[in-house]
Amino acid sequence: EKLDKIIPGTFGKTNDGLVYYKDGVRLNASNLATGSKMFAIIKMLLDTGRIKKQTLLVLDEPESHLHPQWQNVFAEIIVLLVKELGVKILLTTHSPNFMLAIDAFMRKYNINDKSNFYQTKNLGDGFVEYVDVTNNMEKIYQDFLVYLTEVKSIHDSFTDPEDA
């Protein structure tokens, strides 16, 4: 239902490839906006029955081309896939907003026990360690905050107080 509000049309295959139909208009799916494609892919997989219980979806920074508001919607859809269909998700992100949205919707839908969160720790020489932070999400948020604080400080040092 949430996907239908964002991507209200349908998809089909033609000799030209994948097409999107909405209100009698046909559009080559490759011409969809980059952010819309993430929603479209999930919708197509659901519509064709390719996403079902025990499906493993690997999503590498799916929020990277999404407005923060759409990141929140996409996070909720991902959480609902886990809750309603039993889908397994392997997800990476560098977005504090998206991370918080995933965490918030998991709490809202009471599926905290169906997740694990890991954070990379740089060991040097190109090696990293994956640290389980499932029970300490604040560690992730604190690390994100360091970078935001750093750039805010730079911004403030070059901003005239009268312009603020």
Which sequence ranges carry the predicted segments?
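Electropositive, glycine-dotted interaction segments
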Residues: 1-11, 22-23
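Active-site-adjacent bridging/hinge elements
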Residues: 13-16
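Switch/communication elements of ASCE P-loop NTPase nucleotide-binding domains
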Residues: 19-154
